[in-house]
Structures are given as C-alpha cells and as structure tokens.
Amino acid sequence: MIDFLKQLPHLEPYGNPFYFIYLGIALLPIFIGLFFKKRFAIYECLVSITFIVLALTGTHASQILALLFYIVWQIIWVYSYKRYRSQRDNKWVFYLHSFLVVLPLILVKVEPTINGTQSLLNFLGISYLTFRAVGMIIEMRDGVLKEFTLGEFLRFMLFMPTFTSGPIDRFKRFNEDYQSIPNRDELLNMLEQAVKYIMLGFLYKFVLAQIFGSMLLPPLKAQALSQGGIFNLPTLGVMYVYGFDLFFDFAGYSMFALAVSNLMGIKSPINFDKPFISRDMKEFWNRWHMSLSFWFRDFVFMRLVIVLMRNKVFKNRNTTSNVAYIINMMVMGFWHGITWYYIAYGIFHGIGLVINDAWLRKKKTINKDRKKAGLKPLPENKWTKALGIFITFNTVMLSFLIFSGFLNDLWFTKK
C-alpha cells in the first residue's frame, strides 16, 4: 500500500505554478456548476481527496494512513459526544471528549521531544483539523451545534483549500456557507476577489518571501552565528528579515487558500489584515493570524475567564484576565511545539497583552483625573498613533525572533 502511494506524484499545496494549473482545471466544473446554482457534491469530494492525497504522497506517503486513522478517531469521539449531548450534559464528559479529540495532536507534539523522532500519527494539517474537531465539541456543549450528518462532518474536516494550514473555520459558519449557493453577481465578485488573492499571493509567497527568506536571511544568520554572543547587529537584521519572511510566506499561503475557497463557493475567514500597522498588542492579535487568534479568544481565553471567576480564584477581575491572557498565549505557544522558544513566544505575548491592558486602564484613569482638573485628555493624534505603531511593530518583531528558534542556535549550539 505504502509503495503504491509513493509512486503517485507529489503536489506541494500552493508550492509551484503547476499546482495552480492542475487545481484550476479541477475547479472549473465546480465553478461552472455554482454559476448555474448547482453543487456537484461528489465531484467536489473527489477533488478535495485527490489533492489532499497528492499533498501527502512521495516521502510523506505514510501520512495518508495517519490521516485515515485520525479521521476515524475523530468520527468516533465527535459522534459519541453528539449522541451523549442530545440527552445529557456533564462537564467531565465534555472534558474527556475534548481531551480524546486533542490526544493525537498531543502525541504528535510530545513524541519528538521524548525520543527525537516524528510520531507515526503525524500528517500535514493535523493541527488545523484538530481545531475544527475541538470547535465542534465545544459548540455542541454550548448548544450552538446540534445536528449534522457524517457527510457534512467529513466535508468540513477535509475541505481541501484550508486543509494544511488554515484559515481555521467553524462548522456552523462553513456549513451555512456551503448550503447557500451564491447568486451570479456574488459569484462573479468572489471570482474577482479570487483573482486578486492569487495575484497578491504570488507577490507575497513567490517574490517577497523568496527575497526575505532565501536571499537576505541565510547570509544574515551566518554573520550573526560567526560573531556569536548574546546579541549582535546581524541578529537585529535576522529579527526584521525573518519577521517579514514569516508574514509574506504565511499571508501568501492564506491568500491562495481564500482564492480557492472562493472558487468553490465558500468565503473562508481571512487571516491577516495589515498587522504591522497595529497600534497596540491587542489590535495586533485582531489583525494577525485572525482565525487562530479568534479561536483561542473564544474557546480558551473567554472560557478560562469564566471558570476562574465562577470559582472565585482571584478577587480582582483584572488579575483574572491577566492570568487568562498568559495561560491562553502559553497554550498557543505549546501548540506550535514543545520547545523553549515557542513557549517563551507565547508567554512574551501574554505579558504583552497584560501590559497593554494595564496601560489602557491607566490611560483611562489619567484622562478622568485630567478632566476633573479641567485639563484636556492625553493627546491622540497622528504622532501618538505613529509611536504606538512603532512600539508594537518592534515588539512583535522581537517576538518573531524568539519564535524563529534562531536564538537557540546563537546561544546554545556549539560552534
């Protein structure tokens, strides 16, 4: 079986122009069908499965079996909880099912740390599929999601455009989108948007990301490592160049995913909205990797705040939110991987959000006192906005340097 799969051609998702040619040909009947208010569900399924399989062939062929196991595992526990939730509601049963749904991802993240090898359960896209499955469990607990068929579940989990790296969608939003076929005017607007996304994606991923990631970054890293020390000027260059490379590469991928989703009649959530013009850290997370940020906000941060307040863990509401910020972002760090720099990245952003909130509260108090004293509030103009953008941008770039793992090489790798 594995030998047969290895013989199949490998197509890296959004990796080269040929991928887009093959994908465009495959999507043409789908788009024409939508134009005449018809969905070819079986054909859509075949296209999704074909391109997912071709993304996992070659050296990745064993991942196809891992994906099959994973899907069966999720069907068992998602449907187990669906059946249970239709009759009863117990928080421990909810916690157990949530844990079981996340368990394959936990094993995938932990195994390399323990024995230095990749887990047999690992496959391209497991993190993002786990977000989808856990989101369904949580929405069933909330009563937002009650009924869905096996076909709808599989269509959501195996939606090809966003399979490998998001954006992260929610079942209810996705399914409503799928069931409501856009009219011709909407569809033409989606086509126009898709063309813009593809052009911007090519600029981001194949031009700008190549310049920053392939041309500028390697020599800067080499210079920084040769100089050594805690920090040096080339490391400062690495910080900015890596940050731009990360953005253009990931944002370019997201543009492609949005474009292909549009061509399949689905308006997937956007992931980036000019994050580098953010005036503070909270605004940054409302603009950067938005589908991930909003998922953690809704399903981790808000629920953690409710649990802490309900159990009166802290008397002060601000302390509660501060602790929730740090835990929320630390969990996000662990999701990226169990390394000190991913975890430090999460804690760094958690502390950044705490400081951000503290400043907003302090600013509110200062303005209130100034009003009582007959003074104008603290200035808010283009200069204060520029200062906020400057501070936030450099703070974010420093966090990306931590995230990159380069400091691990600079500080701990023997030369």
Swiss-Prot record:
Stretches assigned to the Extracellular side: 1-16, 57-60, 116-125, 228-232, 337-339, 405-415
Enzyme kind, highest EC tier: transferase
Active site: H336
Entry's Gene Ontology BP terms: lipoteichoic acid biosynthetic process
Enzyme Commission number(s) of this protein: 2.3.1.-
Stretches buried in the membrane, not crossing it: 150-179, 275-311
Pathway: Cell wall biogenesis; lipoteichoic acid biosynthesis
Compartments in which it is found: Cell membrane
One Pfam family cited in the UniProt record for this chain: MBOAT
Record text about domains: Consists of a ring of transmembrane domains, which shield a highly conserved extracellular structural funnel extending into the middle of the lipid bilayer. The conserved catalytic His residue is located at the bottom of this funnel and is connected to the intracellular DltC through a narrow tunnel.
Record's protein name: Teichoic acid D-alanyltransferase
Organism encoding this protein: Streptococcus thermophilus (strain ATCC BAA-250 / LMG 18311)
